[in-house]
Amino acid sequence: MKVTNWGNYPVIDAAVHSPASFDEMKKIVASSSELIARGMGRCYGDSSLNATIISTLRMDHILAFDDATGSITCEAGVRFSELLDAFVPRGWFLPVTPGTKFITVGGAIA
């Protein structure tokens, strides 16, 4: 599969794995010596590019929300846009937001 980053350069060929669960992800990680996790690929450099990629986009579930504290537990592939859509109407906002809402929680942490 051809992949690139925010700037659309470089474009590389990569083997992209897309697990839908933590168990699937563990199997992929155990079977590959060199891989990189990737969300939306919105980084400015090449840090989301590698010959072997594990995409977190299917791991996109919000698992828990504490309405008293605003604490969210979610999988790495949850997009900021989904968090904002779900929690701004409830009176909550993320304490830090980037210039785009098209990133994943995992990418923001990375």
What are these regions (language model features)?
Residues 7-102:
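Glycine-rich N-terminal segment of FAD-binding domains in flavoprotein oxidoreductases
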Residues 1-4:
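N-terminal regions that are enriched for targeting/export leaders
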Residues 110:
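Short glycine- and basic-residue-enriched patches
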